[in-house]
């Protein structure tokens, strides 16, 4: 078995996933590019999409293979991991990037669309981590990078399904970072902002120019490497900038027994001093977009 580290990237055929795969290869990893080639809404498929990125890596002198299995199923996630183990005999890092969009207001959203988005973003990440876990433990320097979003951290109108899945990944990071610590695993998440097919309809053109996926991937390459010492972090990243996101609590206050007293306490707690509060992901991204818009 080679000493070369092996990284598996889901959603690796386009946008951020492709950029991550190229960055991991540039760092020296063998890369398993996993992507069904589906459309933005998760329908259809093109097995050649993943192979095109793997071929691009090989043409540049790297080592890569492709898999077009659907990691939003137990069997597909296991098959993707098995592909890595069969070809390389090891798996050291998982970058869970696969995702789809089916945006609608919650009142109008079919539950099938809710389920589909949660399955691809949250369940697929968990399925892949579960399938890869024994190999990541065996590595001794196993690394997992999940892909969260400001939409989950702060909320975004019309994205109840997407936001629920992305915040679910934060919970998964919190637990897996604890459970993997003794085995040397490091589990982190990024909340990226980049010009991709998901964001191009949503962000102003001036900002998109400063939000290349390649400005996110160096962070992912580090988090997936043996050099990464941190675990349990959620890092918002884009436009060449990065910030840590944390859940904070106010001071504890006495909870009265009467309705009026409870209402007053809740109103008081709604305005917590310290930190930078955001009412939505749009507000949270505003400072980053302002920087990106000024980039040449």
Locate each region found by the language model.
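Canonical Rossmann dinucleotide-binding motif of NAD(H)/NADP(H)-dependent dehydrogenases/reductases
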Residues: 2-33
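A glycine-rich helix->loop->beta "capping" turn
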Residues: 3, 60-63, 83-96, 102, ...
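Residue(s) in the substrate-gating loop at a strand-loop-helix junction
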Residues: 149
């Amino acid at each position: 078995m080679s000493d070369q580290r092996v990284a598996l990237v889901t959603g690796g055929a386009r946008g951020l996933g492709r950029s991550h795969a190229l960055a991991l290869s540039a760092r020296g990893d063998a890369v398993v590019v996993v992507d069904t080639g589906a459309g933005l809404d998760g329908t259809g498929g093109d097995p050649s999409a993943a192979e095109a990125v793997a071929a691009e890596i090989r043409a540049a002198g790297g080592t890569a293979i492709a898999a077009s299995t659907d990691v939003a199923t137990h069997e597909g996630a296991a098959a993707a991991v098995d592909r890595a183990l069969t070809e390389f005999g090891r798996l050291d890092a998982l970058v869970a990037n696969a995702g789809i969009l089916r945006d609608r207001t919650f009142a109008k959203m079919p539950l099938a669309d809710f389920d589909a988005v949660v399955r691809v973003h949250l369940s697929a990440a968990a399925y892949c981590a579960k399938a890869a876990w024994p190999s990541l433990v065996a590595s001794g320097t196993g690394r997992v990078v999940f892909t969260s979003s400001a939409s989950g951290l702060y909320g975004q109108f019309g994205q109840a399904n997407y936001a629920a899945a992305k915040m679910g990944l934060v919970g998964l990071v919190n637990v897996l970072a604890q459970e993997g610590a003794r085995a040397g695993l490091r589990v982190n998440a990024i909340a990226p902002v980049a010009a991709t097919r998901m964001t191009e309809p949503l962000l102003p053109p001036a900002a998109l120019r400063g939000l290349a996926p390649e400005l996110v991937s160096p962070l992912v390459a580090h988090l997936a490497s043996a050099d990464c010492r941190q675990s349990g972090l959620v890092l918002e990243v884009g436009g060449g900038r990065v910030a840590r996101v944390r859940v904070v609590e106010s001071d504890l206050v006495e909870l009265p027994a009467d309705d009026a007293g409870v209402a007053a306490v809740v109103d008081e707690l709604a305005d917590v001093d310290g930190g930078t509060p955001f009412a939505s992901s749009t507000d949270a991204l505003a400072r980053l977009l302002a920087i990106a818009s000024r980039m040449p």
